[in-house]
């Protein structure tokens, strides 16, 4: 099993494209097996597997800092940062929490559990980095409806004029727990429909650079996009379109019902 050999992000950097595909399959199988016994968030994590592999392939955590909004979609991140046994061995299913936790790993920046906090937290990390004269990448990962929260908009407003390295990965699956509504999400749908070319672009309007990845479940496309923005000297949004629940038929068909689950029969 390839996942058994991944003890930290450095092990990802030597994988081939085919091995990354296989690793994603193994990670989803581990997520599925654990959720069937333990319960927990489901759809968000299944949609983020390839993006998490790509992030840890390109960036250099924990030097580069990841801030996961809510952090309910960080199970894959935990698997790849030395905590895989908590997803492979039933005896260790309770060894990790359902959210990021600095007491578990140096790869986790904050104890998070509430929505829309990542952009403000990440902007603070970027400001502190600059005051210290350091140069690591600061990466905020936000999705599942969090972008329309008030604190996220405050963070976006601040980041838009920071004029320093700040990378926002917008995980767009057109969902919160349930279907999203409102003018902001209408604009995001226009961006998806035009491969990121719509002039109705909130991020550009607020002063941020912008990249669009049509298939956010394609590790190679994601790696190319993340390499393009690594060490960038200004704020940028990488807008990735993912499928919530990807890889498990029932979760793909009922994205709201499979946002979170109690233990269940896999078949």
Annotate each PLM feature:
Residues 1, 7-10, 37, 82-85, ...:
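Residue-level signal for pocket-adjacent positions within structured domains
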Residues 7, 25-31, 97-102, 132-133, ...:
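Short amphipathic alpha-helical segments, especially helix-boundary/capping motifs
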Residues 15-23, 87-94, 250-252:
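Short, functional N-terminal and low-complexity linear motifs
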Residues 37, 45-56, 60, 76, ...:
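Short alpha-helical interface elements
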Residues 41-162:
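Cofactor-binding active-site loop characterized by glycine-rich and histidine/acidic residues
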Residues 108-267:
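Glycine-rich ThDP/TPP pyrophosphate-binding loop and its adjacent helix/strand module
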């Amino acid at each position: 099993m390839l996942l058994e050999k991944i003890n930290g992000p450095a092990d990802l950097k030597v994988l081939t494209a085919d091995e990354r595909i296989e690793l994603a399959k193994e990670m989803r199988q581990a997520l599925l097996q654990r959720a069937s016994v333990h319960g927990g968030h489901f759809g968000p994590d299944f949609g983020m597997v390839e993006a998490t592999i790509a992030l840890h392939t390109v960036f250099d955590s924990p030097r580069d800092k990841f801030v996961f909004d809510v952090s309910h979609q960080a199970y894959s991140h935990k698997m790849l940062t030395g905590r895989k046994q908590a997803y492979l061995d039933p005896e260790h299913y309770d060894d990790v929490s359902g959210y990021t936790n600095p007491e578990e790993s140096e790869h986790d920046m904050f104890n998070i559990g509430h929505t829309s906090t990542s952009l403000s937290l990440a902007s603070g990390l970027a400001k502190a980095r600059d005051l210290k004269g350091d140069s690591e990448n600061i990466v905020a990962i936000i999705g599942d409806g969090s972008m329309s929260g008030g604190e996220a908009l405050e963070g976006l407003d601040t980041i838009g004029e920071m004029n320093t390295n700040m990378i926002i990965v917008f995980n767009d699956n057109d969902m919160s727990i349930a279907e999203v509504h409102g003018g902001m999400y209408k604009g995001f749908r226009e961006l998806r429909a035009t491969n990121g070319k719509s002039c109705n672009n909130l991020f550009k309007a607020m002063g941020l650079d912008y990249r669009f990845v049509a298939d956010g479940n394609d590790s190679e496309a994601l790696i190319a996009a993340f390499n393009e923005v690594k060490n960038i000297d200004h704020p940028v949004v990488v807008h990735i379109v993912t499928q919530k629940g990807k890889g498990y038929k029932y979760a793909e068909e009922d994205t709201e019902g499979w946002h979170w689950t109690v233990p269940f029969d896999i078949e």
